[in-house]
Regions:
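Conserved redox-cofactor binding core of oxidoreductases
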Residues: 90-167, 179, 223-225
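Short beta-strand to alpha-helix junction loop
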Residues: 68-81, 114-132, 190-198, 223-227, ...
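An anion/pyrophosphate-binding glycine-rich loop and adjacent beta-alpha core
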Residues: 203, 209-313, 365, 374-376, ...
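Conserved N-terminal glycine-rich FAD pyrophosphate-binding loop of Rossmann-like flavoproteins
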Residues: 28-61, 65, 229-232
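N-terminal Rossmann-like FAD-binding beta1-loop-alpha1 element of flavoenzymes
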Residues: 1-24
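Glycine- and aromatic-enriched mobile tails/lids
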Residues: 16, 29-31, 39-45, 86, ...
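Short hydrophobic core segments
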Residues: 2-4, 171-181
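Core beta-strand elements of the Rossmann-like FAD/NAD(P) dinucleotide-binding domain
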Residues: 167-175, 335-336
């Protein structure tokens, strides 16, 4: 069994598969370049005294703009409270309040249900605990290499072609799990690692797996507006603690919608910027409490010369999360025998057209664990050998980023998506990143109306997220 990717989903899968032997294939050391480490906002779970799973389900369905799969929502959200207990047993140190867990409020949640660790370092704390457990598990091998192709025969997956430097290595496996994260690196500005360019989707496409909902890309409304491609995230939790959107004059402009769903807020921020205004988060009412509550964000701001206790924080939308992906069932199985997917690369049906804040770590952990259990339960097949083969072309996101940002961003139109698709088609034969971008643009063109994170100029608004 091979797991491609070393974030929360991949590590949970490896631990769930134990004591069956599994290899984690990762381009670098565990934790390096993983979006999971960068996740600030927290993990949503209905564990509060005033909360219940039905409320969390309702919030998720509302944010998903009518395109969630209710069964998937009920299953994944329903597993949240038990997941919290599992993570505590694995050594994750969530923040506490008195005798219980500290629970925060974020956009479009009806109750405080967001678990944090070290204020705004939830993903990093989860990864710390999971990496320690993985390294202490003898059945898990970590191999630093880059997956370049899923090898598929008549009866399903047969292995992975990987690159170590310029050398091609064929690794036999009848079960392969993709946990490669998202596609933010296909845009000029992203909250993801710049290296997150949809590698898992490219591998799945090449293998012939079914993909869906590729047009639904969430843009986080509050990335720190500083030079560079990978922009630091200013978590939703900052607004949950009372920060407000203001323009360059200090005037509020969100009309009480500071905690609306992300697609709604991102479009409002984008429109304000397009109109020539500045957009800032004003958290000055928190004063010195800001650095205590959000130490990582305070440090990020300090490096940019900003003191949130006395200055508004400049923000802009940036590509953040991909709701679409490889189509999977409840066990993470794709349409290819032996190929699984979990985490952001997978399309589970949980998010619909727009992800609810802090549901991603929840999904990654629950679905990663489910996929690991399913892989371990699948009967092994006879391994096979291969003739020597060369590496396929490496993906190059550089020529893709300007087109994706211009035409597949917060607001789209048919002419722009058509132009992007034409340009991508010219590059697709020799550039897997362009081949993936082409499918995203075609999915956007096919969805003629606006829904959730897919906002098409002139398109009818089919469903307004609550």
């Amino acid at each position: 069994m091979i797991i491609i990717g070393g974030g929360v989903a991949g590590l949970m899968a490896a631990l769930a598969a134990a004591p069956r032997r599994v290899t984690i294939l990762n381009p670098g050391p565990l934790g390096a370049g993983a979006a999971s480490v960068m996740s600030q906002g927290g993990l949503a779970a209905a564990v509060g005294a005033t909360d219940d799973v039905a409320l969390h389900v309702a919030d998720t369905l509302a944010a998903g703009a009518g395109l969630c799969e209710p069964e998937a929502v009920a299953r994944i959200i329903g597993a949240g409270p038990a997941l919290v207990e599992t993570l505590l047993r694995l050594g994750v140190r969530f923040d506490r309040h008195g005798d219980g867990l500290a629970l925060g409020l974020e956009a479009a949640h009806a109750r405080p249900r967001i678990l944090h660790a070290n204020g705004d370092q939830t993903g990093a704390e989860m990864m710390r605990a999971l990496i320690a457990k993985v390294r202490a598990t003898p059945s898990i091998t970590i191999f630093e290499a880059t997956a370049r192709k899923i090898l598929v025969g008549d009866n399903g997956v047969t292995g992975v072609l990987a690159a170590v430097g310029d050398e091609a290595i064929a690794l036999p496996a009848d079960r392969v799990l993709l946990t490669t994260g998202g596609i933010g690196g296909l845009f000029l500005h992203t909250t993801n690692p710049e290296s997150a360019i949809g590698q898992g989707l490219m591998l799945a496409m090449d293998a012939g797996a079914a993909l869906a909902d590729l047009e639904f890309i969430q843009f986080h409304p509050t990335a720190l507006d500083v030079p560079g491609a990978s922009l630091p995230l200013i978590s939703e939790a900052v607004r949950g603690e009372g920060a407000r959107f203001v323009d360059e004059t200090g005037a509020y402009f969100m009309a009480g919608g500071d905690l609306a769903p992300r697609d709604v807020v991102a479009r409002a921020v984008f429109a304000h910027l397009q109109a020539g205004h500045g957009v800032f988060l004003d958290a000055r009412e928190m004063g010195v409490r800001f650095a205590a509550r959000f130490p990582a964000i305070a440090a990020i701001c300090a490096r940019a010369g900003i003191d949130p206790a006395t200055q508004p924080i400049p923000v802009r939308p940036a590509a953040h999360y991909h709701m679409g992906g490889v189509v999977v069932d409840a066990a993470g199985r794709t349409s290819i025998e032996g190929l699984y997917a979990a985490g952001e690369v997978a399309r589970t049906g949980l998010h619909g057209a727009n992800r609810l804040a802090s549901n991603s770590l929840l999904e990654a952990a629950i679905c990663g664990e489910a996929a690991g259990l399913a892989m371990a339960a699948q009967g092994a097949k006879q391994s096979r050998g291969w003739q020597a083969m060369g590496l396929p072309p490496a993906p190059d996101a550089a020529p893709v980023r300007p087109l994706m940002s211009a035409h597949m961003g917060v607001l789209r139109d048919g002419a722009g998506m058509g132009l992007a698709a034409q340009k991508f088609s010219e590059m697709a034969g020799q550039n897997p990143a362009a081949a993936l971008a082409l499918q995203i643009a075609l999915a956007g063109l096919a969805r003629r109306d606006s829904v959730g994170a897919h906002a098409r100029a002139g398109g009818k608004q089919l469903y307004k997220a609550a």
